[in-house]
A protein has these predicted regions:
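Karyopherin-beta/Importin-beta family HEAT-repeat alpha-solenoid scaffold
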Residues: 1-594
Length: 594
């Protein structure tokens, strides 16, 4: 950035005065349908969001209102509207305090809700960018970034009219919008469930198929974030969802019916996790036979949804799943080694996840015949160039260690080798010259040198203004501090945490590998990615706690509170304690999450 606002006030004023003319240029290119120049103009404003906040500050409110109107105008090209909505999403994410201070959240929310009605018969599952899908994304960010008074409360007030509308597009839009806002304001929405759930239940029985599909999506999203609260309504929700599933099962040649199948599986997958085992057990005989029929369906999404749901049913129902265990494992085993295509690898990951949940449900003895082939497949998965599948393998090892505890020792060589190789992966050479267009990549995944990298902004700080919302000490929200969070770093976060599960459950069997593991974890304490640091420190403390318990089992006196310490631990335990404490204190001052 060549212009320094603090040092060049005249130049800053000149630039600010040019903004209205720049907006006029954008408007004229949109009105004329000049795609190339319009896209350059949108890109210019996106770029300015990443520059000094002072550049847009004078006209920021007017610019936001212009983009709202542009995104809401149905007479212009959808691509231009989607660009305007994308700009608004970036504004909310990176100028959230400015947006909050303008008190424009309610208008953004209601405009976005109206745009969602344009979804029509298009599936919300599709990935093509449209104004309606962009509006759903805007609602998601609004709910996550702004207070309920500006987003969720006005949304809920408006939903009554949408839910009761004679137009199915409005009913569909209402429940989809509700689902998108749950994650951002779960606590507030939990207080309104007594009014929300009757409406959602009614929409599950709607005369229009797409509305019922949207209602299933809404239930899944509600249950994801409010599992316990939604789970209490299982007696009414599950029968309604099964009714949809059964109706759709009678017409599998229709894509909309397949969407209902997938939606039912996803909704029950999310909902049943919030049930107590005795409640989940009531539904096993109804759910498992229905879903298992889709293990061999040609639609990959249906197959994956059904397999994932059965895993969750097993996890929730525990021993009640045993009567179906042999048949289900026979149906799933054929997918454990598939690897002919990316779709095969995706499905293989879902299957391994579900098998891990099933193992936890039925216990060590019934699952024993399947452990060796599953462990062999999980070790092979590390070399299939599929990051998600590698993470699945690590999580599976964690589950198997919890189920088999010391008996997992026979698989420790392979598991430790895989985890160690993960932590030793090189993260150098992944630096990217993001430049001033980096904002276009924030939140996206890019592939560089065969590695998937998720680009994340390191700060959500907002710009200074006269509002009392900015009294907290904050830096200007410049984009100079954008970092890439690589898939490798995310893998390391999971691997470090899995180490903790394996160590704490295999206990003495892990001692031959302990020194090398602790050494590697200590190296990760100052990793650039917060998730890796937290996992490494957490596992180090779990390791110390496990060794302390083993020392007590060997005759050491139990710990007693007070100073000076009344228990003298073995020298090796003291040494580990000192290392862990020093590692913790070395990052203590700089960590936000202590």
């Amino acid at each position: 950035m060549l212009l320094e606002p603090d040092e060049e006030p005249k130049e800053l004023a000149m630039f600010q005065d040019a903004i209205p003319a720049m907006v006029s240029v954008l408007k004229s290119t949109v009105d004329e349908g000049d795609e190339n120049n319009a896209m350059q103009a949108f890109e210019c404003f996106q770029t300015l969001l990443g520059c000094e906040s002072a550049l847009l500050q004078k006209h920021f409110g007017d610019l936001v209102k212009f983009m709202i109107e542009l995104g809401s105008t149905t007479s212009i090209d959808d691509e231009f509207r989607s660009q305007a909505l994308a700009f608004l999403m970036q504004c909310v994410r990176y100028r959230k305090l400015k947006i909050q201070g303008l008190r424009i959240g309610e208008e953004l929310t209601l405009k976005a809700l109206q745009i969602v009605t344009e979804l029509g018969d298009l599936s919300s599952e599709e990935e093509d960018v449209t104004p309606a899908r962009s509006a759903l994304g805007l609602l998601d960010i609004l709910a996550s970034s702004l207070p309920p008074s500006q987003v969720v409360i006005p949304l809920l007030k408006a939903l009554g009219g949408y839910f009761s509308s004679q137009d199915p597009d409005y009913r569909q839009a209402g429940v989809l919008a509700l689902g998108m806002c749950v994650e951002g304001a779960p606590d507030f929405i939990a207080t309104q469930l007594h009014e929300i759930l009757p409406a959602v239940l009614s929409l599950l029985e709607d005369s229009d198929l797409k509305v019922r599909g949207a209602a299933l999506n809404g239930v899944a999203r509600l249950a994801d974030d409010l599992a316990e609260d939604i789970g209490k309504e299982h007696a009414t929700l599950i029968p309604a969802m099964l009714k949809n599933f059964d109706l759709a099962s009678n017409n599998l040649n229709d894509e909309r019916s397949l969407q209902i199948i997938r939606g039912s599986c996803h909704a029950i997958d999310s909902l049943i996790e919030g049930l107590e085992p005795e409640d989940a057990a009531k539904y096993v005989s109804e759910l498992v036979p229905r879903f298992s029929k889709f293990f061999h369906h040609e639609d990959l999404k249906c197959k994956s949804a059904a397999i994932g749901a059965v895993g969750s049913i097993a996890s929730a129902s525990e021993k009640a799943f045993l009567p179906f265990f042999p048949e289900i494992m026979q149906g799933l085993s054929q997918y454990v080694r598939i690897k002919d295509s990316p779709d095969d690898l995706d499905l293989r990951g879902v299957v391994c996840d579900s098998m891990g949940k099933i193992a936890s449900a039925v216990g060590a003895e019934p699952f024993e015949p399947y452990v060796l082939p599953l462990m062999e497949a999980s070790e092979e998965a590390l070399h299939l160039d599929h990051p998600r599948l590698r993470e699945t393998s690590y999580i599976l090892w964690s589950t198997m260690a919890k189920v088999y505890e010391e008996q997992f020792s026979k698989y420790l060589p392979g598991a430790v080798k895989g985890l160690q190789e993960c932590l030793e992966q090189d993260e150098t050479g992944l630096d990217v010259e993001l430049g001033e267009h980096a904002k276009d990549l924030v939140g996206a995944e890019v592939v560089i040198d065969g590695r998937k990298i998720k680009v994340a902004a390191a700060t959500d700080d907002d710009d200074d203004d006269d509002s009392d919302l900015n009294e907290a000490a904050m830096d200007d929200d410049e984009w100079d501090d954008i970092n890439g969070v690589s898939a490798v770093a995310m893998e390391k976060e999971i691997a470090a945490e899995v180490y903790g599960d394996i160590i704490s459950h295999t206990r003495r069997q892990y001692l031959p590998y302990l020194e090398a593991t602790v050494t590697k974890l200590l190296e990760l304490v100052d990793h650039t990615y917060e998730g890796v640091r937290k996992s490494a420190i957490g596992t180090l403390w779990r390791t110390y706690a496990s060794l302390w318990e083993m020392a007590e089992a060997d005759g050491m006196a139990k710990w007693k509170p007070g100073l000076p310490p009344q228990v003298d631990p073995p020298q090796e335990l003291k040494k580990l304690g000192n290392l862990v404490m020093m590692a913790t204190m070395s990052v203590w001052q700089d960590e936000m999450d202590r």
